[in-house]
C-alpha cells in the first residue's frame, strides 16, 4: 500500500463517521514493514496536482509514526506550471515522490484512533472489511 494511500483511508465503522478521530488511521512503525520501489518514474506534473489534494497534517502524523520526522511543518507551495519550478522546488518534489509514491507498507497494522479497530495490511493490501458486529 503506497504511503499516499494512507491519506485517503479512514475508519469505516459506522460509529466513527461522526468522529474526527477516524482519520488518519494510526500506524505502529514497529509493526509496519516499509519497502521502496524505485522503479516508479518521477512525474513532477502529477505531484504538483496531488500535493494540493493531500491533507498535510495527516501526512506529517503518519510519516512521524513510521519514523520520518524530516518533513516541513507546513505544506510546501509550488508555482502552478512546471516551467516556473526552481531547482529547490524540484528537489522537494523529488523527496515527496520518494515518500508518497515509492514508499509502501508491505505488512502492518492500521488502527482507528476513535474505536481502536485494527485493519491489517498483508502483501501491501489493506483489509478494510469489517466483522458483522461493526458494520
Swiss-Prot record:
Entry keyword annotation includes Transmembrane: no
Molecular-function annotations in GO: protein heterodimerization activity; tRNA methyltransferase activator activity
One GO cellular-component annotation of the UniProt record comes to: eRF1 methyltransferase complex
One Pfam short name: Trm112p
Q: Where is this protein found?
A: Cytoplasm; Nucleus
Q: Keywords in alphabetical order, please.
A: Cytoplasm, Nucleus
Keyword Phosphoprotein in annotation: no
Q: Which GO terms describe its biological process?
A: maturation of LSU-rRNA; maturation of SSU-rRNA; positive regulation of rRNA processing; positive regulation of termination of DNA-templated transcription; ribosomal large subunit biogenesis; ribosomal small subunit biogenesis; rRNA (guanine-N7)-methylation; tRNA methylation
| Chain ranges of the TRM112 domain | 2-131
Q: Which Gene3D superfamilies match?
A: 2.20.25.10
Q: What is its main location?
A: cytoplasm
Q: What else is known?
A: Present with 4800 molecules/cell in log phase SD medium.
Describe its partners and assembly state: Heterodimer of MTQ2-TRM112, forming the eRF1 methyltransferase. TRM112 is necessary for the solubility and activity of the catalytic subunit MTQ2. Interacts with TRM11; required for full tRNA methyltransferase activity. Interacts with BUD23; required for full rRNA methyltransferase activity. Interacts with RCM1, NOP2, TRM9 and LYS9.
> What is the recorded function of this protein according to its Swiss-Prot or TrEMBL entry?
Acts as an activator of both rRNA/tRNA and protein methyltransferases. Together with methyltransferase MTQ2, required for the methylation of eRF1 on 'Gln-182'. Together with methyltransferase TRM11, required for the formation of 2-methylguanosine at position 10 (m2G10) in tRNA. Together with methyltransferase BUD23, required for the formation of 7-methylguanine at position 1575 (m7G1575) in 18S rRNA. Involved in biogenesis of both 40S and 60S ribosomal subunits.
Q: Which family does it belong to?
A: Belongs to the TRM112 family.
Q: What is this protein called?
A: Multifunctional methyltransferase subunit TRM112
Q: What is the lineage of its organism?
A: Eukaryota, Fungi, Dikarya, Ascomycota, Saccharomycotina
